[in-house]
Amino acid sequence: MTSTSSATRPNQKDLEKLVDETPASGPKRSIAFLAGVATFGSLLFGYDTGVIAGALPYMYMPRIAGGLRINEFQEGLVGACLALGAAIGAIAGGRLSDHYGRRHNILLLAGIFILGTLGCTFAPNIAVLYLFRFILGIAVGGASATVPVYLAESAPTRVRGSLIALDQFMIVAGQLLAYSMNAILSSAHGGPQVYVTEDPSGTLTGGQWYPWDQVQNVSSAVITAGDGMAWRWMLVLATIPAICLWLGMRLMPESGRWYASKDRYYEAIGALKRIRDPKLDNLSEEIAQIAELQQREDAQGHWSLRRTASVAWTRRLLLIGVGLACFDQLTGINTAMYYLPKILAAAGFSAADSITLNVITGAVACAGAGFGLYLVSKLARRHVG
Protein backbone atom coordinates (compact mmCIF):
# COMPACT_ATOMS: atom_id res chain seq x y z
CA MET A 1 0.00 0.00 0.00
CA THR A 2 1.59 3.29 -1.05
CA SER A 3 -1.26 5.74 -1.38
CA THR A 4 -4.98 6.29 -1.02
CA SER A 5 -7.47 8.39 -2.92
CA SER A 6 -9.62 11.03 -1.25
CA ALA A 7 -12.66 8.88 -1.94
CA THR A 8 -11.15 6.01 0.07
CA ARG A 9 -9.37 8.03 2.76
CA PRO A 10 -8.86 5.72 5.78
CA ASN A 11 -11.13 6.12 8.78
CA GLN A 12 -10.05 6.10 12.43
CA LYS A 13 -9.80 2.30 12.65
CA ASP A 14 -7.93 2.02 9.38
CA LEU A 15 -5.48 4.70 10.50
CA GLU A 16 -4.80 2.97 13.81
CA LYS A 17 -4.18 -0.30 11.99
CA LEU A 18 -1.96 1.48 9.49
CA VAL A 19 0.07 3.03 12.31
CA ASP A 20 0.58 -0.38 13.90
CA GLU A 21 1.59 -2.10 10.66
CA THR A 22 3.63 0.60 8.92
CA PRO A 23 7.39 0.56 9.59
CA ALA A 24 9.53 3.68 9.69
CA SER A 25 10.54 4.66 6.16
CA GLY A 26 14.21 4.95 7.10
CA PRO A 27 16.66 5.48 9.96
CA LYS A 28 15.43 7.35 13.02
CA ARG A 29 16.27 11.05 13.23
CA SER A 30 15.82 13.23 16.27
CA ILE A 31 13.67 16.31 15.82
CA ALA A 32 16.63 18.40 17.04
CA PHE A 33 18.82 16.99 14.25
CA LEU A 34 16.10 17.64 11.67
CA ALA A 35 15.69 21.22 12.87
CA GLY A 36 19.44 21.79 12.91
CA VAL A 37 19.78 20.63 9.31
CA ALA A 38 16.69 22.38 7.92
CA THR A 39 17.58 25.71 9.51
CA PHE A 40 20.82 25.81 7.53
CA GLY A 41 18.41 27.25 4.95
CA SER A 42 17.51 30.03 7.39
CA LEU A 43 21.19 30.54 8.21
CA LEU A 44 21.89 30.98 4.50
CA PHE A 45 19.02 33.46 4.26
CA GLY A 46 20.70 35.56 6.94
CA TYR A 47 24.25 35.13 5.65
CA ASP A 48 23.47 36.05 2.05
CA THR A 49 21.50 39.14 3.05
CA GLY A 50 24.10 40.28 5.58
CA VAL A 51 27.39 39.49 3.86
CA ILE A 52 26.99 42.19 1.22
CA ALA A 53 27.39 44.90 3.88
CA GLY A 54 31.06 44.05 4.32
CA ALA A 55 31.67 43.20 0.67
CA LEU A 56 30.48 46.51 -0.82
CA PRO A 57 33.38 48.66 0.45
CA TYR A 58 35.78 46.34 -1.38
CA MET A 59 33.66 46.36 -4.55
CA TYR A 60 34.17 50.13 -4.80
CA MET A 61 37.89 49.59 -5.30
CA PRO A 62 39.36 49.65 -8.85
CA ARG A 63 39.64 46.43 -10.83
CA ILE A 64 43.43 46.46 -10.67
CA ALA A 65 43.07 46.33 -6.88
CA GLY A 66 40.57 43.44 -6.95
CA GLY A 67 37.34 45.45 -6.80
CA LEU A 68 34.61 46.08 -9.39
CA ARG A 69 34.77 49.91 -9.31
CA ILE A 70 31.05 50.18 -8.65
CA ASN A 71 29.20 53.45 -8.06
CA GLU A 72 26.35 54.27 -5.68
CA PHE A 73 23.63 53.38 -8.19
CA GLN A 74 25.22 50.00 -8.86
CA GLU A 75 25.60 49.48 -5.12
CA GLY A 76 21.84 49.88 -4.73
CA LEU A 77 21.16 47.42 -7.54
CA VAL A 78 23.33 44.77 -5.88
CA GLY A 79 20.91 44.76 -2.96
CA ALA A 80 17.80 45.23 -5.10
CA CYS A 81 18.54 42.22 -7.32
CA LEU A 82 18.55 39.91 -4.32
CA ALA A 83 15.31 41.42 -3.00
CA LEU A 84 13.61 41.02 -6.40
CA GLY A 85 14.74 37.41 -6.65
CA ALA A 86 13.54 36.77 -3.09
CA ALA A 87 10.04 38.06 -3.92
CA ILE A 88 9.81 35.70 -6.89
CA GLY A 89 11.39 32.83 -4.95
CA ALA A 90 8.93 33.17 -2.08
CA ILE A 91 5.95 32.85 -4.43
CA ALA A 92 7.44 30.08 -6.56
CA GLY A 93 8.91 28.27 -3.55
CA GLY A 94 5.54 27.88 -1.90
CA ARG A 95 3.94 26.49 -5.03
CA LEU A 96 6.81 24.09 -5.74
CA SER A 97 6.87 22.77 -2.18
CA ASP A 98 3.11 22.17 -2.33
CA HIS A 99 3.51 20.23 -5.56
CA TYR A 100 6.78 18.33 -5.09
CA GLY A 101 7.23 18.27 -1.32
CA ARG A 102 9.03 20.36 1.29
CA ARG A 103 12.16 18.22 1.47
CA HIS A 104 12.61 18.07 -2.29
CA ASN A 105 12.17 21.82 -2.54
CA ILE A 106 14.79 22.48 0.14
CA LEU A 107 17.22 20.19 -1.70
CA LEU A 108 16.59 22.20 -4.87
CA LEU A 109 17.10 25.46 -2.98
CA ALA A 110 20.40 24.19 -1.56
CA GLY A 111 21.59 23.65 -5.13
CA ILE A 112 20.47 27.17 -6.09
CA PHE A 113 22.28 28.58 -3.05
CA ILE A 114 25.49 26.88 -4.18
CA LEU A 115 25.06 28.03 -7.80
CA GLY A 116 24.22 31.60 -6.81
CA THR A 117 27.08 31.85 -4.32
CA LEU A 118 29.70 30.55 -6.74
CA GLY A 119 28.33 32.76 -9.52
CA CYS A 120 28.62 35.85 -7.32
CA THR A 121 32.07 34.85 -6.07
CA PHE A 122 33.56 34.47 -9.54
CA ALA A 123 31.59 37.28 -11.22
CA PRO A 124 33.97 39.02 -13.65
CA ASN A 125 31.89 42.20 -13.76
CA ILE A 126 28.93 43.90 -12.15
CA ALA A 127 26.41 42.64 -14.73
CA VAL A 128 27.20 39.00 -13.92
CA LEU A 129 27.03 39.84 -10.22
CA TYR A 130 23.50 41.24 -10.72
CA LEU A 131 22.42 38.00 -12.41
CA PHE A 132 23.71 35.71 -9.69
CA ARG A 133 22.49 37.96 -6.87
CA PHE A 134 19.04 37.60 -8.44
CA ILE A 135 19.47 33.79 -8.56
CA LEU A 136 20.66 33.85 -4.95
CA GLY A 137 17.57 35.88 -4.09
CA ILE A 138 15.35 33.14 -5.50
CA ALA A 139 16.95 30.71 -3.05
CA VAL A 140 16.59 33.17 -0.17
CA GLY A 141 12.90 33.73 -0.91
CA GLY A 142 12.26 30.04 -1.44
CA ALA A 143 13.91 29.22 1.88
CA SER A 144 11.80 31.81 3.69
CA ALA A 145 8.65 30.15 2.32
CA THR A 146 9.65 26.50 2.69
CA VAL A 147 11.84 26.00 5.76
CA PRO A 148 9.30 27.27 8.35
CA VAL A 149 6.58 25.10 6.80
CA TYR A 150 8.83 22.02 6.86
CA LEU A 151 9.68 22.68 10.50
CA ALA A 152 6.05 23.25 11.50
CA GLU A 153 4.83 20.13 9.72
CA SER A 154 7.65 17.93 11.01
CA ALA A 155 7.66 19.07 14.64
CA PRO A 156 5.49 17.47 17.32
CA THR A 157 3.01 19.85 18.94
CA ARG A 158 5.01 20.04 22.18
CA VAL A 159 7.95 21.86 20.50
CA ARG A 160 6.38 23.33 17.36
CA GLY A 161 6.39 26.93 18.55
CA SER A 162 10.03 26.77 19.59
CA LEU A 163 11.15 25.29 16.27
CA ILE A 164 9.33 27.95 14.28
CA ALA A 165 11.01 30.61 16.45
CA LEU A 166 14.33 28.83 15.85
CA ASP A 167 13.91 29.58 12.15
CA GLN A 168 13.93 33.33 12.85
CA PHE A 169 16.83 32.97 15.28
CA MET A 170 18.91 31.21 12.63
CA ILE A 171 18.25 34.02 10.14
CA VAL A 172 19.76 36.62 12.46
CA ALA A 173 22.47 34.13 13.46
CA GLY A 174 23.35 33.92 9.77
CA GLN A 175 23.59 37.70 9.62
CA LEU A 176 25.82 37.74 12.69
CA LEU A 177 27.99 35.04 11.11
CA ALA A 178 28.27 37.12 7.93
CA TYR A 179 29.20 40.28 9.81
CA SER A 180 31.73 38.35 11.90
CA MET A 181 33.39 36.74 8.88
CA ASN A 182 33.43 40.12 7.13
CA ALA A 183 35.20 41.62 10.15
CA ILE A 184 37.70 38.75 10.41
CA LEU A 185 38.59 38.86 6.72
CA SER A 186 38.76 42.65 6.70
CA SER A 187 41.02 42.68 9.76
CA ALA A 188 43.24 39.99 8.24
CA HIS A 189 43.74 42.22 5.19
CA GLY A 190 44.10 45.40 7.25
CA GLY A 191 40.90 46.81 5.77
CA PRO A 192 40.44 47.92 2.14
CA GLN A 193 43.94 48.93 0.96
CA VAL A 194 45.62 49.76 -2.33
CA TYR A 195 49.24 50.00 -3.42
CA VAL A 196 50.12 53.39 -4.90
CA THR A 197 53.04 53.25 -7.32
CA GLU A 198 53.18 57.00 -7.84
CA ASP A 199 51.18 60.18 -7.45
CA PRO A 200 52.20 63.07 -9.72
CA SER A 201 50.24 65.52 -7.57
CA GLY A 202 52.45 64.78 -4.58
CA THR A 203 49.46 64.16 -2.30
CA LEU A 204 50.57 60.58 -1.71
CA THR A 205 54.02 59.03 -1.59
CA GLY A 206 54.63 56.39 -4.25
CA GLY A 207 55.63 52.85 -3.39
CA GLN A 208 53.37 52.56 -0.34
CA TRP A 209 50.11 50.92 0.77
CA TYR A 210 47.26 53.22 1.71
CA PRO A 211 43.73 52.72 3.05
CA TRP A 212 41.27 53.00 0.19
CA ASP A 213 39.44 55.73 2.15
CA GLN A 214 42.52 57.91 1.80
CA VAL A 215 43.14 57.22 -1.88
CA GLN A 216 39.69 57.13 -3.49
CA ASN A 217 39.46 60.92 -3.89
CA VAL A 218 43.01 61.31 -5.22
CA SER A 219 42.43 60.98 -8.96
CA SER A 220 46.11 61.34 -9.83
CA ALA A 221 47.22 58.31 -7.80
CA VAL A 222 48.51 55.39 -9.88
CA ILE A 223 47.22 52.18 -8.27
CA THR A 224 48.77 48.86 -9.24
CA ALA A 225 47.55 46.43 -6.56
CA GLY A 226 45.15 46.04 -3.65
CA ASP A 227 43.32 43.63 -1.38
CA GLY A 228 39.94 44.10 -3.04
CA MET A 229 39.59 40.35 -3.63
CA ALA A 230 38.51 40.04 0.02
CA TRP A 231 34.86 40.48 -1.01
CA ARG A 232 35.02 37.25 -3.00
CA TRP A 233 36.21 35.33 0.09
CA MET A 234 33.36 36.82 2.10
CA LEU A 235 30.81 35.56 -0.41
CA VAL A 236 32.25 32.11 -1.11
CA LEU A 237 32.05 31.06 2.55
CA ALA A 238 28.28 30.66 2.09
CA THR A 239 28.91 27.49 0.08
CA ILE A 240 29.82 25.65 3.30
CA PRO A 241 26.35 25.82 4.95
CA ALA A 242 24.75 25.33 1.52
CA ILE A 243 26.59 22.04 1.05
CA CYS A 244 25.72 21.04 4.63
CA LEU A 245 22.06 21.77 3.87
CA TRP A 246 22.10 19.66 0.71
CA LEU A 247 23.87 16.72 2.35
CA GLY A 248 21.82 16.91 5.54
CA MET A 249 18.43 17.08 3.84
CA ARG A 250 19.22 13.90 1.96
CA LEU A 251 19.13 12.16 5.35
CA MET A 252 15.81 13.69 6.40
CA PRO A 253 12.26 12.41 5.77
CA GLU A 254 9.65 14.26 3.76
CA SER A 255 6.96 16.12 5.67
CA GLY A 256 4.32 13.68 6.89
CA ARG A 257 1.73 16.44 6.64
CA TRP A 258 2.59 16.93 2.97
CA TYR A 259 2.19 13.21 2.29
CA ALA A 260 -1.21 13.34 3.98
CA SER A 261 -2.24 16.29 1.80
CA LYS A 262 -1.70 13.97 -1.17
CA ASP A 263 -3.64 11.15 0.58
CA ARG A 264 -0.45 9.11 0.90
CA TYR A 265 -0.97 8.01 4.49
CA TYR A 266 1.36 5.01 4.31
CA GLU A 267 4.28 7.30 3.47
CA ALA A 268 3.07 9.90 5.99
CA ILE A 269 3.14 7.41 8.85
CA GLY A 270 6.49 5.98 7.74
CA ALA A 271 8.01 9.47 7.63
CA LEU A 272 6.59 10.49 11.01
CA LYS A 273 7.83 7.30 12.66
CA ARG A 274 11.38 8.34 11.77
CA ILE A 275 11.14 11.54 13.84
CA ARG A 276 8.70 10.70 16.64
CA ASP A 277 9.53 9.46 20.13
CA PRO A 278 6.99 6.72 20.97
CA LYS A 279 7.37 7.56 24.67
CA LEU A 280 6.38 11.20 24.17
CA ASP A 281 4.29 11.30 20.99
CA ASN A 282 0.98 9.59 20.24
CA LEU A 283 1.32 8.94 16.52
CA SER A 284 -2.17 7.44 16.13
CA GLU A 285 -3.73 10.56 17.57
CA GLU A 286 -1.53 12.84 15.49
CA ILE A 287 -2.24 11.11 12.18
CA ALA A 288 -5.98 11.13 12.99
CA GLN A 289 -5.81 14.89 13.58
CA ILE A 290 -3.94 15.36 10.30
CA ALA A 291 -6.57 13.33 8.43
CA GLU A 292 -9.40 15.32 10.03
CA LEU A 293 -7.72 18.61 9.17
CA GLN A 294 -7.21 17.44 5.59
CA GLN A 295 -10.90 16.58 5.29
CA ARG A 296 -11.84 20.05 6.51
CA GLU A 297 -9.50 21.69 4.02
CA ASP A 298 -10.92 19.59 1.20
CA ALA A 299 -14.45 20.55 2.22
CA GLN A 300 -13.57 24.25 2.28
CA GLY A 301 -12.00 24.13 -1.17
CA HIS A 302 -9.32 26.46 -2.49
CA TRP A 303 -8.88 29.76 -0.67
CA SER A 304 -8.00 32.49 -3.16
CA LEU A 305 -6.82 35.93 -2.05
CA ARG A 306 -10.24 37.35 -2.94
CA ARG A 307 -12.01 34.76 -0.82
CA THR A 308 -9.62 35.34 2.07
CA ALA A 309 -10.30 39.08 1.95
CA SER A 310 -14.08 38.59 1.78
CA VAL A 311 -14.39 36.63 5.06
CA ALA A 312 -14.19 38.74 8.22
CA TRP A 313 -11.90 36.57 10.38
CA THR A 314 -9.49 35.64 7.58
CA ARG A 315 -9.44 39.26 6.39
CA ARG A 316 -8.45 40.33 9.90
CA LEU A 317 -5.63 37.77 9.97
CA LEU A 318 -4.50 38.87 6.51
CA LEU A 319 -4.40 42.54 7.51
CA ILE A 320 -2.51 41.79 10.72
CA GLY A 321 0.04 39.65 8.87
CA VAL A 322 0.55 42.14 6.04
CA GLY A 323 0.62 45.05 8.50
CA LEU A 324 3.32 43.46 10.64
CA ALA A 325 5.39 42.64 7.55
CA CYS A 326 5.07 46.21 6.23
CA PHE A 327 5.93 47.69 9.63
CA ASP A 328 9.00 45.47 9.81
CA GLN A 329 10.21 46.78 6.45
CA LEU A 330 9.33 50.43 7.16
CA THR A 331 11.54 50.46 10.25
CA GLY A 332 14.47 50.74 7.84
CA ILE A 333 16.25 47.68 9.18
CA ASN A 334 17.12 46.53 5.66
CA THR A 335 19.01 49.77 5.06
CA ALA A 336 21.15 49.08 8.12
CA MET A 337 21.51 45.42 7.16
CA TYR A 338 22.89 46.20 3.69
CA TYR A 339 24.63 49.55 4.13
CA LEU A 340 25.57 50.13 7.79
CA PRO A 341 29.34 50.11 7.08
CA LYS A 342 28.77 52.84 4.46
CA ILE A 343 26.65 54.82 6.93
CA LEU A 344 29.33 54.52 9.60
CA ALA A 345 32.02 55.49 7.09
CA ALA A 346 30.02 58.63 6.24
CA ALA A 347 29.95 59.39 9.98
CA GLY A 348 33.76 59.42 10.04
CA PHE A 349 34.77 55.84 10.79
CA SER A 350 37.32 54.09 8.60
CA ALA A 351 36.07 51.36 6.26
CA ALA A 352 37.83 48.69 8.34
CA ASP A 353 36.32 49.95 11.61
CA SER A 354 32.87 50.27 10.01
CA ILE A 355 32.91 46.62 8.94
CA THR A 356 33.98 45.55 12.43
CA LEU A 357 31.35 47.69 14.20
CA ASN A 358 28.64 46.06 12.10
CA VAL A 359 29.13 42.92 14.22
CA ILE A 360 27.49 44.76 17.13
CA THR A 361 24.19 45.13 15.25
CA GLY A 362 24.23 41.43 14.42
CA ALA A 363 24.91 40.51 18.04
CA VAL A 364 22.05 42.69 19.29
CA ALA A 365 19.65 41.19 16.73
CA CYS A 366 20.79 37.70 17.70
CA ALA A 367 20.23 38.45 21.39
CA GLY A 368 16.74 39.76 20.64
CA ALA A 369 15.85 36.70 18.59
CA GLY A 370 17.25 34.46 21.31
CA PHE A 371 15.07 36.19 23.89
CA GLY A 372 12.06 35.74 21.62
CA LEU A 373 12.90 32.05 21.27
CA TYR A 374 13.00 31.77 25.06
CA LEU A 375 9.62 33.50 25.41
CA VAL A 376 8.01 31.26 22.80
CA SER A 377 9.24 28.20 24.69
CA LYS A 378 7.59 29.52 27.86
CA LEU A 379 4.49 31.32 26.58
CA ALA A 380 1.94 30.95 23.79
CA ARG A 381 3.04 32.44 20.46
CA ARG A 382 0.02 34.74 20.42
CA HIS A 383 1.00 36.23 23.80
CA VAL A 384 4.57 36.82 22.64
CA GLY A 385 3.31 38.64 19.55
Regions found by a protein language model. Give the residues of each.
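Transmembrane-helix signature of 12-pass secondary carriers
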Residues: T2-D277, N282-E285, A291-G385
